[in-house]
Amino acid sequence: AASDVYKRQSQVIERDGKFYWYVTVEHKDIPGKSIGVAVSDSPLGPFVDARGSALITNDMTVERTKIYWDDIDPTIFIDDDGQAYLYWGNTQCYYAKLKNNMIELDGPIVHVDLPRFTEAPWIHKRGDWYYLSYASEFPEKICYAMSRSITGPWEYKGILNEIAGNSNTNHQAIIEFKGDWYFIYHNGGINPTGGSYRRSVCIDRLYYNEDGTMKRIQMTTEGVQ
């Protein structure tokens, strides 16, 4: 109900046995990019529109910028207390709390001030630290900030991943699996037609320093096994 085309830049998250898919869409009535949400009983789908309307539309963020593509790249994080947060943005980073139903905002949209933020926010937590990673500048590197609270204030920590091969763009995810941490990103390594918008998914190991900061990613051709 919210869109005609441009379904990309998305994330699926599970809550109470339901799978919620947050996705960037092109709104059919309100100019600019929007964020919609669909729901399914399975991560494989089928997904159906959970609201009948967009969750975020471009007219909700005009105070910060007049561009029509700032409302993209949604990511969801459910904190230890059960509160869910939606982060998103291009050139400007935003967050908002979600209600328990996962399809309505529960409070105002908040702007997050990050150095040289371009797009692709991602939240993860390790111990008592929250990490906000994002694509920075163009061509895009992945940078990150840390905080003791998911709502900040955020302390910038620098570059996590340099420009990936043959790609001006990048978009990351950071996950823990069986006690190890992994950095998921893309490059343009597909031969012979790979590039910024024909991308290969890459996975490499992520390591932490004793103070909780993250070590710079060592990109490999082989990935992980």
Regions found by a protein language model. Name each.
Residues 1-6:
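Short, small-residue-biased leader/transition segments that mark boundaries at the very start
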Residues 65-69, 111-116, 162-165:
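Surface loop/turn motifs at the tips and blade-to-blade linkers of beta-strand repeat domains
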Residues 30-78:
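Asp-box/WD-like beta-propeller blade repeats and closely related beta-sheet repeat scaffolds
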Residues 30-36, 92-99, 140-145, 192-203:
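Structural motif
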Residues 8-31, 66, 73-94, 122-136, ...:
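Hydrophobic core segments of beta-strands in well-ordered, beta-rich domains
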Residues 38-45, 97-105, 144-152, 207-214:
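Short loop/turn segments immediately following beta-strands, especially the blade-tip
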Residues 48-55, 106-113, 155-161, 215-222:
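Beta-propeller fold detector
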Residues 116-154, 158, 167-170:
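Loop/turn-rich, solvent-exposed surfaces of beta-rich toroidal or solenoidal domains
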